[in-house]
Each structure stands twice: as C-alpha cells, then as structure tokens.
A protein has these predicted regions:
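RNA pseudouridine synthases
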Residues: 1-148
Length: 148
C-alpha cells in the first residue's frame, strides 16, 4: 500500500503554535519553486500581537527588518486589520525560521497567534476545518505554476 501512495512534498511548514494553510504537492519542482527565495512567492498571514502595531513597525517591515542576529529580512508588508492594531496582516516574499515572530521581536512585540491565509495568491479554503484538506482546483494549480 505504501508504494501505491504518491510522494508528497511540503511547500513550506508551520511551527506547532501556528495554524493555517499548508500546501502539500506531488510535484517536487513546484514545491521547490514556491520555497525558493529567487521566486519571491507571496505568503499572507493574520497575526495577533500583544502590543499594537506602530508606525516604526510598519516602516521597519517596509524597509526590511534587521534581526537581533544581524540578518536583514527582505521588505515585507504589514497592515492593521483591527482598529486597535493588535490584529495585522503580514505579507512575506521570503521564508526564514520563525521570521514573523523574530521580526516583531525586534520591536519588542510578541506574537500571540499566527495563521497563514494564502500562498502564491491561493487562499486557504474557509470551508475547511483545522486538519481537513482538499485538492487544489485546476485554476489554483495554474496560478501556483505561474508564480515564477
């Protein structure tokens, strides 16, 4: 039975405290293209902070945050989703270990929740409960294949 199953490649991962869209594919080249920093595939997240979004955070994300270890992240988008600035949308085109948490950490802001909403313009299906999955539509596959 194991030999009859397709080999699946994850196109990104989430840590155990994050939720949302995880893309698994049997197309290794597609997974590589989505993950490759050279392709700058956009990923969007809804993030709940322990302190409101500030103008300094917005400017820092737009310019590219330099982490405490000296590594500078690519510019990223951050926009408030709530009036209190505690829930924000973050748009990344790069994927580094705990990137969002580390970027907000530079501004002494903690991340209480992190939820990936989309990858390469393909949004998480709101009808899916946590742990559920579905196959991509032909249009979604085409969109991902054209992100290069």
């Amino acid at each position: 039975l194991h030999d009859a199953l397709p080999i699946l490649f994850p196109a990104g991962r989430l840590d155990k405290t994050s939720t949302g869209f995880v893309l698994l594919t049997d197309d290794g080249a597609l997974a590589h293209d989505i993950l490759s920093p050279a392709h700058h595939v956009e990923k969007q997240y809804v993030v709940t902070l322990d302190t409101p979004l500030t103008d300094a955070m917005r400017r820092g994300f737009a310019a590219g945050v330099t982490l405490t270890d000296g590594e500078t992240m690519a510019p990223a988008g951050v926009e408030p989703l709530t009036d209190d600035g505690l829930t924000v949308q973050v748009t990344l085109r790069q994927g580094v270990y705990h990137q969002i948490k580390r970027m907000f950490g530079v501004f002494d802001a903690g991340v209480n929740a992190l939820h990936r909403e989309s990858i390469g313009g393909v949004a998480l299906d709101p009808a899916l409960a946590p742990g559920q999955w579905r196959e991509l539509t032909a249009a979604e596959v085409e969109r991902l294949q054209n992100v290069k």
